[in-house]
Structures are given as C-alpha cells and as structure tokens.
Amino acid sequence: MQDDESSQIFMGPEGDQLPLVEMGSCKPEASDQWDCVLVADLQTLKIQKHAQKQLQFLENLESNGFHFKMLKDQKKVFFGIRADSDVIDKYRTLLMNPEDSGSRDEQSFNIATTRIRIVSFVVNNKLKPGDTFEDLVKDGVFETMFLLHKGEQNLKNIWARWRNMFEPQPIDEIREYFGEKVALYFTWLGWYTYMLVPAAVVGLIVFLSGFALFDSSQISKEICSANDIFMCPLGDHSHRYLRLSEMCTFAKLTHLFDNEGTVLFAIFMALWATVFLEIWKRKRAHEVQSWKLYEWDEEEEEMALELINSPHYKLKDHRHSYLSSTIILILSLFMICLMIGMAHVLVVYRVLAGALFSSLVKQQVTTAVVVTGAVVHYIIIVIMTKVNKYVALKLCKFEESGTFSEQERKFTVKFFILQFFAHFSSLIYIAFILGRINGHPGKSTRLAGLWKLEECHLSGCMMDLFIQMAIIMGLKQTLSNCVEYLCPLLAHKWRLMWASKHGHMSKDPELKEWQRNYYMNPINTFSLFDEFMEMMIQYGFTTIFVAAFPLAPLLALFSNLVEIRLDAIKMVRLQRRLVPRKAKDIGTWLQVLETIGVLAVIANGMVIAFTSEFIPRVVYKYHYGPCRTNRTFTDDCLTNYVNHSLSVFYTKHFNDHSRMEGQENVTVCRYRDYRNEHDYNLSEQFWFILAIRLTFVILFEHFALCIKLIAAWFVPDVPQKVKNEVLQEKYDRIRHRMRFSSRSTDV
C-alpha cells in the first residue's frame, strides 16, 4: 500500500477501511490529465455491497492499464480515470504495420482524443456479465460517467458564440477536440448551408415572379370578375353558395407558387441535390485525406479497442436469421402502417374540425381547418419521434447486430423510415388524395356515413399543401430550435444555481472543475445522431414537395445559420463532452440523402402533374382553348379557362336543398372537377388530362433522373489530387517495405 498521496480509502458500513486501488508509482495528476470521471452517491461508500462492486470494477480497469483518483464533495464521490501510456502504445501498435514507421495511422494520431476514446470504450464495455458499467448504474453502484472538457476555451471564443454566426468554422480545431465524426458533421452542415444559397435565391425568384403576374394573370382576372358564377358548398359546414369572385385573393396568392416557373424550379432542385451530393463527396475526400484517414478502417478500430479491453476477445461471426429478419420486417411494416394511420387520424380531425369551426369562423372554415390540422400534425410528429426511437432501438436489440458501427447503420435506417412516414404521410395525403375521393355535390363520400370528407380550397389543392408545409417547417425551424437551445441552457443554469445555493461547489480547483463538468447537461449515444436526423428531415422538406413550397430552401438557409452556432454552443458550453470518434465519412446518412434525392424527383413530378394546375392549363391552351383553332388570337390563350375547368351541378339535385342559405334563385352551381353535366360521371376530358398527367410524370422523372446521372458522372466523387496523394502514399509504403525486406535479408 502506498502513502496517502497515492491511494484512496473506502469506508465500509462499520468504519472498516477498504483499499480502493493503488496508484502505483504515479504521482498526483493535474486536472487536465484525467480524461473520464465516474460519479457515485457518497452514501454508496457506506454500503458494503456497493463499495465492493465499485472496488472490483475499478480493479478490473486497473488490470487493463488505467489509473484512478478519488475526490469527494458533500453529496458525491468522483473517480477520475486516465489511460496509461502503455495502453496508448498498444493501441498505436494494433493499428499500425510495424514495418511502416510513417504510416497513415501515426500521422493521424491524436493522443488526447485517442486516450479519451479508449477510456470511454473500456469503461462501457467490460465483458464480464453483470459487471458492465450500465449494469452498475442500474444497481445504483455508480450514477453516471462523463468526459472532462479541457482546452475548449479557444473554441468558445472563435466558434461557440452567436456573434460568430457568419464566420468560417474552425474544422481542424473541432476535429482535434471532438474527433473526426463531429468534425465531419459540422463540415457537412456548413457545406449544406453554403449550397442552400443558390437554391434559396432561385426559389425566391420563382416565388417573386408570381408577384409580377399577381394582377395580370388571365386566370386571376377571370376569377376576380366572375360575379355571376356561384360555387357549390364545399362541405357540411357551409350552407351558402359562394360567388367565385370571393376567391379572388386566394387565386392570386396561389399563383405565387403555382406557375410555369415551378416546373423549372423542380428540375433545378433535382440538379441541385445531385451536384450538392457529388461536390460533398469530393469535399469529404479532401478533408479525410488531409487528416490521413482516407484508408482508415472502422472495423480495425473497433477490433483494436476490443483487444485493449480484453486480450481474449473473439470475433463474432456474421449470422443471418431469416426468422428474425421476417419478424423485424413485419414489425417495421406495422409501425409504417401506424404512421400512415396517423394521417387518417388527421383526416378525421379535419372533418370534425370543419363541422366545429362552421359555427365560429364561417367565412374561413377551410383555412382554419388547414392551419389547425398542420399544428396537430406537428404535435403528432413530436410525440411519434420518441415512440419511433424506442421502437427502432428495440428492433435493433432483437436483431443482435455485431459491431457498434453495424448497429448504428441498422438503427439509422429503421429510425429514418419511421420518421419519414411520421413527417410526410400527411403531406402525401394532401398532395395526392385530398379532394379526389369526395364524389360530387349531391353524392358526397362521407365519414361513417355522417360527415362529408373535406375538399381542397376553391383556389386549388396547392394552397392547402403550401400552408401545411409552411406551418410544419416553420414550427420545426423556430419552435424546435428554441426548445433545443433554451431547455439545455435553463437546465444547466438551474443545476449551477442549485449547487451554489446549497454550498456543493468546492473551493478545490480540481474538484470544482469536475463539478462544473458534472453539472452540465448529460449526453447519450444519440446526441450527434439526433442532430443528423434533424438535418435529414429538413433536407427532405427542402427537396420533397419543394414544387409546392419554393421558399423551403430559404427557410432552411436561415435555420442552418442558427443551427450551426446552436449546436456549437450546446456541445462546448452546455453539454458534457462527446466521445471523440474517428470517421472517414458520414456513414449511412449519405445513402439517406441519395434516397431523398430520388424521392424528391418522384414527388415533385407528381405534385406538378396531379396537385398543381399546370397540366390542365397546358392542355387547355393547346387542345381546348382559343389558340388551338385561331393562331392569330391576340388575347391570352387561357381566356375562358376558368369556366372551362369548372363542372356544372343543378341545385335541384341537392338532397338538402332547403338548408341552403340565401340565393334561392340559384339553379346552377359550379365545382372543381371534370364531369358530365347530365349524369355527373367523369368526362372524356378528365381521362384525357389524366393521360397527359401520367405522361408528364414519366417524362419529368426520366428527364430529371438523366440530369442527375449526367451530373453524377460529370463530377468525380474523388478529386484527382486526392487520388494522386493516396497513390503516392501506397507507393511510399511499398518502397519502404522493400528496403525493410532487403535489410532483413542482409542480416
């Protein structure tokens, strides 16, 4: 047993002295030499069972080459841990070819982050059953574990400040402090934000171009002057005939984002998404090559950590169980059906809300239903996010994947699929189903035979889709960001105030520093994962259905400028330190981005074809309108389009005609559809336009996908400079081995 400076003592329940662990020959260490701190309640030292478990766990760590130090305050006991230099040397040796004195691993070696990564891995992955740190936390032996912030002051000054919002990010310093995985996240986020600038500018131009035609649009003119056209009531909440001219303002607003520029913008965004990903691949290759990680192997890294943790570690064979895969598939499909069911819940809400609002806001019932429906959808998203994460975790545990990286990939796929349906199921309903299964006036489809299904706004379904996207995206970018920042900030301030008020803050500099880290907000495995997921969903809103909401890239740009600094402030000032992890790419998220890009092409093509009025306008202009027969027609080719696009319904065929308010002399009302006047069946014109819609979708998707493929081929994933550097490194290693081999032969 060493002197009191180099050892600490547990006190048993009867005052018995239990040796904690000898510090060996090491002298007391400075605060910045301790990487990880375990925390336990002070009362656990008086419980023999817990004290023995703590001692056993720490002795297990000591046998792996770790050193410890214990400090106490009035309530807690802190165990500082650091790895011995022999552990670092072992790690370096495992990842290097001993013949390559200048290997890429040595060049990319960062002792501080490596030591932290090793300590964190070993503490969390002791192999003895019932002896893992997670088990000890559940048993109350330990409370938590955290990594110490140290040397972060420069990042606070130049990065984690709101006033630095428009300053470049210090990626190299982020990498040295948080590791390559976090550095790649901020590199990707910064590049994504930069690339949003052209998309936001083009989207704004498309939106503003609608203002240029705000009053001059032929369709708007016809709607605003149609005082003699009465529209049939939309639902049970409306019992009067609206003059078409009352829709004048909404018709003009709809034209802001439902015009010819929308098609060009959708094609532009398909090209933008491809160029963004291709140039990102090049930027990623350049960054990881500068870090000497281009050929780094994640599986080798994990195996090296496992061997440091236990020299007797054995590889787990890859196994595939068709039974478990089938069960997981069925459960996943069930959850997807549940997400789709959420859309049906919203349908029911909107129908019932229409009946409720009819007595409160008679003039704007449809708008009120759309707005409140979007808010309800946002609340459902918040709730289902927690449910989806729990379900995805359970599915991954049931699957029993091997390495951590493999588990992370499978969890990412499952969680994203569930989140995608949670966020976009309602938008899919509004874009492609709303107003298309309602029947016609006098014979409407009803929910449970009582309530008439809602219909699109009289100005078109694009207005409903625009409002839904604007509200959901606006709430996610504002309310979610406020909660994401204010909750950790207030929680951190509250912990510090509580500790100071009760006199728990020590005057000892080292213990005070540990306490400062302890009172920061806790982190978990999903801290960085959640940031990525948030950005993936935002990217989906920015590309999918962007034809209906050209301002989405602009909102995303403003949000990301805030998001970068918000995440920086959280990680440096408000949260405990993340485990520095190595990485050479953003992993499965790249495949997620590519999938979203393909879905965006399909969705935007269908929105233009089926949701907007683009195809009916084009068909009328060249097949039914005045320009078809009269090439010298001087007026607008869309003249009389509004009257042509509205079907006729005779009010005498209403079952409840007596309930209509006013306009008793109205014998004919109009509604949005293409139906015959005599029997209300779908007209020949409907089927002709449907054929054109389907043709457009096929042509648009093939054209957009061809552009994506050409752009992907034209822009190489890896710069030639990086290829040459990697090739030179391989050449140098081979030459070095040749010299090494020659020396060995000579001996």
Curated annotation (Swiss-Prot):
The keyword Mitochondrion does not apply. Cation channel activity is activated via phosphorylation on Ser-245 by cAMP-dependent protein kinase A (PKA). Inhibited by NaCl. Keywords: Cell membrane, Endoplasmic reticulum, Glycoprotein, Lipid metabolism, Lipid transport, Membrane, Phosphoprotein, Transmembrane, Transmembrane helix, Transport. The chain crosses the membrane at residues 194-214, 260-280, 327-347, 365-385, 415-435, 544-564, 596-616, 696-716. One of its GO terms (molecular function) is intracellularly calcium-gated chloride channel activity. Phosphorylation on Ser-245 by cAMP-dependent protein kinase A (PKA)is essential for activation of its cation channel activity. Highly expressed in the olfactory epithelium, particularly in mature olfactory sensory neurons (at protein level). Expressed in the kidney (at protein level). Predominant expression seen in epithelial tissues. Highly expressed in the small intestine, colon and stomach. GO terms for cellular component: endoplasmic reticulum; plasma membrane. It is found in: Cell membrane; Endoplasmic reticulum. The keyword RNA-binding does not apply. The modification Phosphoserine is found at residue 245. InterPro entries: Anoctamin, Anoctamin_TM. Disruption phenotype: Knockout mice show reduced olfactory behavioral sensitivity, electro-olfactogram signals and neural activity in the olfactory bulb. Conditional knockout in olfactory sensory neurons results in impaired odor discrimination. Glycans are attached at residues 630, 643, 665, 681. Signal peptide: none annotated. It catalyses: a 1,2-diacyl-sn-glycero-3-phospho-L-serine(in) = a 1,2-diacyl-sn-glycero-3-phospho-L-serine(out); a beta-D-galactosyl-(1<->1')-N-acylsphing-4-enine(out) = a beta-D-galactosyl-(1<->1')-N-acylsphing-4-enine(in); a 1,2-diacyl-sn-glycero-3-phosphocholine(in) = a 1,2-diacyl-sn-glycero-3-phosphocholine(out); Ca(2+)(in) = Ca(2+)(out). Residues 215-259, 348-364, 436-543, 617-695 are extracellular. Residues 1-193, 281-326, 386-414, 565-595, 717-747 are cytoplasmic. It is a multi-pass membrane protein. Belongs to the anoctamin family. PKA-activated nonselective cation channel. Discriminates poorly among cations but is more permeable to Ca(2+) ions than to monovalent cations. Acts as a calcium-activated calcium permeable channel which may operate as a endoplasmic reticulum (ER) Ca(2+)-leak channel, reducing the loading of the ER Ca(2+) store. Regulates intracellular Ca2+ signals, ion channel activity, and cytokine release in the renal tissue. Plays an important role in olfaction, amplifying cAMP-evoked cyclic nucleotide-gated (CNG) channel currents in the olfactory sensory neurons. The term 'anoctamin' was coined because these channels are anion selective and have eight (OCT) transmembrane segments. There is some dissatisfaction in the field with the Ano nomenclature because it is not certain that all the members of this family are anion channels or have the 8-transmembrane topology. This is Anoctamin-9.
